[in-house]
Amino acid sequence: MNRKILHLAVPSIISNITVPLLGLVDVAIVGHIGDASYIGAIAVGSMLFNVIYWLFGFLRMGTSGMTSQALGRRDFSEVQRLLVRSLSIGVGIGLVFFILQRWMIGCGLWAMSPEADVVELARRYCYVCIWGAPAVLGLYGFTGWFIGMQNTRIPMVVSLTQNVVNIIASLMLVFVCRMTVEGVALGTVIAQWWGLLMACVLYRLYYRRLGKYDYRHHIFDSEPLKRFFSLNRDIFLRTVCLVAVNLFFTAAGSRESTLVLAVNTLLMTLFTIFSYFMDGFAYAAEALSGKYYGAGNRVAFREVVKRTMMFGVGVAVGFTLLYIIGGENFLSLLTSDEKVITASGAYFWWAVLIPLSGMSAFVFDGIFVGITQSKSMLCSTAIASASFFVLFFVLHPLLGNHALWLAFVLYLLLRGVVLFVIYRSQLR
């Protein structure tokens, strides 16, 4: 079982840790073609699309859980139908985004309220990026399906190749074709469509044998569609809670001062790095728990829960020790601003608590995605999010920015605790 978990987790971790590279390259490119407004436009535009795509991450999660269960039942016709269903819905939503682009981009930029010189550049960036929406959401369906099929290597290969294509295309368009923010955006769009095309090709290469199973009937029957949308509705609402907490965390820091915002952003990077590793084991939990749950093998299912929790504890302890030992030296790798590093000392130990407090939330999220218990996931996240806001507003007058960190640490802990209680009472 340990080997199966690592076989699924490691490729996902490799994919995750390459994600920041793209943002760094985009910023580096525009940093050489204009002033700070270009960098601001890329930051605003990419944040807008990141939030939108994050909200529709249910396409990956819902597909992963249902596919792994169908695989466990050895219902290969349904496995095929799930892919067609997810791809159709993902690409369809992407086309709706394209049709509504003026309204979406206008509202998004209004809500983010960047300075006037940034707004026009960000709008130009977004109007190019929107062409990639069908590819991004279609690839979400493919990625979830591959994970459900116990294959995280194909998503890793697609992700790494996308990154390379994005970098090369952006460099060529900006420095050879003399495009500016549109060049960076078009490089991203080219990479997104390349990723979808590559997923289609790899599917044909590795899963051609599934063509012998008849899947063309009942693809869009009302009952499976109702289940698909019911599951994804709960995951969507859960994601809204996650986005609300994360956006509020940033906004609350900015209201304190620019220095506190910088400190919070720096320390949240420690959480982000930890999450790249834990997401890998969450994906493994999705795939394996769904497969054994679908097969009705409760012994193997409980073993998956036990083993992924053990790996989670190991990763959490490892990162906690790394942060304690590294301390200020670790922060100096992320910034050279001595003022920010010094100010971080007052809040550093809150960030150290994040791995141990957040570990169980990652693992149980993966398990509950795999067994498609979306209502339980929504319940845990809603309770934790409500607690986050209540704690912050009650304690902020007394503790200041410490209240924000205390609320966030307890929010992570509570998500895992609620899911653990549900698992013990209903699933064990």
Would you name each region that the model predicts?
Residues 1-9, 67-134, 165, 174-236, ...:
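Short alpha-helical transmembrane segments in multi-pass integral membrane proteins
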Residues 1-33, 47-62, 66, 91-98, ...:
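N-terminal transmembrane alpha-helices
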Residues 7-26, 128, 139, 161-162, ...:
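Transmembrane helical elements of multi-pass membrane transporters/channels
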Residues 21-40, 109-116, 172-179, 240-273, ...:
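Helix-terminus/linker motif at the lipid-water interface of multi-pass membrane proteins
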Residues 24-28, 141-145, 167-172, 200, ...:
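Alpha-helical transmembrane segments of multipass membrane proteins
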Residues 30-50, 82, 117-121, 181-182, ...:
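Interfacial/gating helices of multi-pass transporter permease domains
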Residues 39-99, 136-155, 263-325, 359-372, ...:
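Small-residue-rich hydrophobic transmembrane alpha-helices
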Residues 60, 128-148, 155-166, 184-200, ...:
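Short runs within selected transmembrane alpha-helices of multi-pass transporters and secretion channels
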